[in-house]
């Protein structure tokens, strides 16, 4: 399965550097010089020549793409990797597509809804769960609230605080 790890942005300077919108949690490893990335739409594989951070933006150059005009042709190209080619040594890490559609249940097995998405954030990741009542609920992806993820069995076990999924007495209805 392909996973988008970045989107090529606008050129930076005249020597083939390009800004990159990062969509991976490990950009320093993913975009290390020598890394080969596939493209969507297909413009052939790109090999990272250099990578550096400038004011919080990742700047890359690719082998064989050496000037501003050539880089401009890559604008909005998605950089993808094939997850099947990668070994995942971390049993405690998931890609959003692995969690989307999983059943969200309590520690006692009571259905709470379905995982819609995984948002990556500064402090912690957040699960977006569509509750059984149709509301979207944001659940911080931390062990006390999400004690177990079982992708093979198709479920995420949650231990939500009172009121997160169930209306509390006296709460106004939306």
Swiss-Prot record:
MF-aspect GO terms: ribosome binding
The keyword Cell membrane is annotated on this UniProt entry: no
Gene Ontology process terms (BP): ribosomal small subunit biogenesis; rRNA processing
InterPro entries listed in its UniProt record: PRC_barrel-like_sf (IPR011033), PRC_RimM (IPR056792), RimM (IPR011961), RimM_N (IPR002676), RimM_N_sf (IPR036976), Transl_B-barrel_sf (IPR009000)
Localization in the cell: Cytoplasm
Record bears the keyword rRNA processing: yes
Keyword list, A-Z: Chaperone, Cytoplasm, Ribosome biogenesis, rRNA processing
Disulfide bonds: none
Residues annotated as domain PRC barrel: 91-164
Main location as per UniProt: cytoplasm
Gene3D superfamilies in alphabetical order: PRC-barrel domain (2.30.30.240), RimM (2.40.30.60)
Domain of life from the UniProt record: Bacteria
UniProt subunit comment: Binds ribosomal protein uS19.
Role noted for this protein: An accessory protein needed during the final step in the assembly of 30S ribosomal subunit, possibly for assembly of the head region. Essential for efficient processing of 16S rRNA. May be needed both before and after RbfA during the maturation of 16S rRNA. It has affinity for free ribosomal 30S subunits but not for 70S ribosomes.
Sequence similarity: Belongs to the RimM family.
Domain free text: The PRC barrel domain binds ribosomal protein uS19.
Designated name of the protein: Ribosome maturation factor RimM
Organism field: Kineococcus radiotolerans (strain ATCC BAA-149 / DSM 14245 / SRS30216)
